[in-house]
């Protein structure tokens, strides 16, 4: 090794720290000097004569009273006289005179601080030379007290470090010298390959032999060996599935490598290849790894990029290994790497020092054994962090056996400081034991000292032991306090976790029970109960449990959590409420109820009699509600979806509940076994009774509707008996219309049902076929088109305008089962029903409610389908067939075949005053009503009305309407009820009228709704007869006839009106009369078909009815 320059003080200090050089210089340069412990060995060996006797010198220990020769190793914390700031490295003792002066001036206190870092074998050797006694005489002893200082780690935490526990001598905080046997030795094999050329690596045959598996091939050059290993073994096909494994004979690597380059670098250890050569002139160093070459280059450049990570240290190093050694030795003073060879207690701060110790002291054989005994996952590069606790494997060394190993775990913030304190205490405790052993082996030195010195030493030692015991007790108390605090925090955290788990278990239990009852959607959270669309559905739907009102009382979180086995079981299935008396379609319901399977019948409990007497309009759903229980024989439709077909596309699939005749249409295709797939989003469901669709087909003489609904019923109804009841209704509806084709008989229907429900039949493919999808699209579009018409649509009732919240309160009380007598009296009295006229009487709102319900039932049977009126509503010419103009919905000619059902038109020609028109129309109404009611009183009132006051005019109308209303044979009564139903809704006739081209000279066209300002007034006389006072504005909505009236200015009011195309014939009995209202009107006579021989003048302004053939 080259000697460092004398001008560089850092280099000199570093060399002195490594113990390789002394301060003196001779002609040969820097010379090595022996360390303190080596000098002690030499001194101990020279003290003995060959004969076994000791040499007595003039400096006998008995003369100066210093004790035995072991005091040579006594050191003092106070620098001796021969160690000064000007000469810190002078290890030789001064002259004898100075020793005598100093010994007489100060008292000597023996200490064993020098023995704390040395081995016991070296300390037990007796030394009695004159030089040793003189050296020991110049020293003064102190009490071995453990001191601690705080240093700042790189992470900002304070680390406790012991001071005065260094094994070797320290000068100004720096170590001098290295342990024996740690100097670098040359390799065992003298051959060193340079690998500078192709054929320059001439080595012996045994060194150039391939030891891969069972190869044993020999080569002349190193390059040939390396090429052979790379091509034949490393990168050959033997490495299957990229399992890079070294199979060199004697290799202790048992694991595979993650990449090929790692195996290539590893094999260089066996072949001796070192391709990375230093380019520095005159150096010639070679390395097998490139990172080692980069580290070596820094020795030439002087670069030191690895700085010490402690804040108060400015040291820098050329490689990370030296920095780690410095931090472990200087800042932590821990020795976690201990020698595992028996009877060896050496421990070191880094693994490299341990390896050097094993090679130098125990030999290469022990090193190879220790190397092979390492675990498979051991890595030389894994070094412990000096800021953390030592590794677990190091705890087996006696140095690291803490005296309070049973203490509790301390807090996280002080774990590092506590570990370092414990390690320092452990080292001091072990060193004290070793010192006591040394005293027992060499003899007690206390009698050899003067009494004052012995007393002071004993007092200092007792004081030190008391301090150590006090520190240990304090640390144990602190650890116990911290452990108690941590235990309390853990108990609180555990209690919070148990409470949270209890809440979660409650929610999971409730959700599982609700899911088992099919009352909770898996895609939506618990929702509060919502209003039912009508009383019929409300009475059939059981109350839905929610988080606010669950099905049963859930245990509170304050009670301890019960075990899973003691969880409450699911309650009994909810039994739906019985259907009230006289439901809609009693006959059909009875038939469906008779053929229901026994397993679907549930025992029903009798309900309160007050609920059975309540009859509310079934179409009072004014907001989106959850799906109620569908009545038997109902066809369900999805709501929403603007797909150009009014929300009824043909891509949906239907499902039938067996036994009930219920068909449901969903947005997802059905599976092979008929179950409905779950769709995305919220689906509001409304229902059509199958009889409603059949009635609709009969009303419009549409045979295609009959066949389609029967096909859907066959496909979706699994129960044959339910299908047979539907087929009977189909036959009865088929007889009511003129047919062009033969209907299916029951045998054909049964065969088609067997085909659809055969396990081998692919229902999904059939449902997704283009023909069926087109059929479904047209079918549901027609249903939506029919319900879009205002005259036939069952619309929700404006509750706020009719009864001022009475109906809302009634529904709320019925839903919750609380309907007392006081509320019933208030509901029947109906003090304020919303009518703002001065003649308002109690009960008018309820009476109008019931009458309108009866009239509307004739239009469409309980159809609960909300159709949004927009430009994109599914309006097409004819519903079926002619769909070319379906995108031209804004034109007048693009109208459905339903538009001719109620198309009233009022064409006013050269009119001057609307009041004149109304008066003339009133006269015409009077003349029409007078044909059926001929009384003297009415004639007198009519004559007085023509020329009398307004009061007589009003009284005459009242008598006229009163008589006509209670005359069951009167046609005015039938029209009057229709007008009451239509006029209550504010926009009933808005879609019923359209303007046509007026004759020449016409200057205004009036809309029926804008011109008709009808007001209903009711009075209840002593005979409980309802008197309806009504201003009848136009004949189109009352009588349904056409005509023209000419007033005084010869201006004509031309009224043109078409009759409905079919009758409102019903196949099932209706409800019983309620509140003494008249029974529903009989169906009107079917209109006469228009022929070409009819009046052509009247047919010019009347739109022609489209004919639809299928």
Swiss-Prot record:
Comp. bias regions, Gly residues = 641-652
Name the GO terms of the biological process aspect. Answer: cell differentiation; central nervous system development; female germ-line sex determination; female somatic sex determination; gonad development; negative regulation of transcription by RNA polymerase II; positive regulation of neuron apoptotic process; positive regulation of transcription by RNA polymerase II
* Amino acid composition bias (Basic and acidic residues), ranges on this chain: 44-61, 886-895, 1092-1103
Query: Which Gene Ontology cellular-component terms appear in the entry?
Result: cytoplasm; nucleus
Q: Does the keyword ATP-binding apply?
A: no
**Compositional bias (Pro residues):** 1076-1086
Record keywords = Cytoplasm, Developmental protein, Differentiation, DNA-binding, Metal-binding, Nucleus, Repeat, Sexual differentiation, Spermatogenesis, Zinc, Zinc-finger
Name the residue ranges with Low complexity bias.
188-201, 597-606
Functionally, this protein is described as follows: Plays a major role in controlling sexual phenotype. Terminal global regulator in a well-characterized cascade of sex-determining genes. Promotes female development. Interacts with tra-2 to promote spermatogenesis. Promotes spermatogenesis through the Tip60 HAT complex and by regulating the expression of genes, such as fog-3, required for male development. Association with chromatin and at the fog-3 promoter requires wdr-5.1, and may also require wdr-5.2. With trr-1, activates the fog-3 gene to determine sperm/oocyte cell fate.
What does the annotation say about its assembly with partners?
Answer: Interacts with the MX regulatory domain of tra-2.
Kindly provide the name given to this protein in its UniProt entry: Sex-determining transformer protein 1
Taxonomic source organism: Caenorhabditis elegans
Q: Which gene encodes it?
A: tra-1
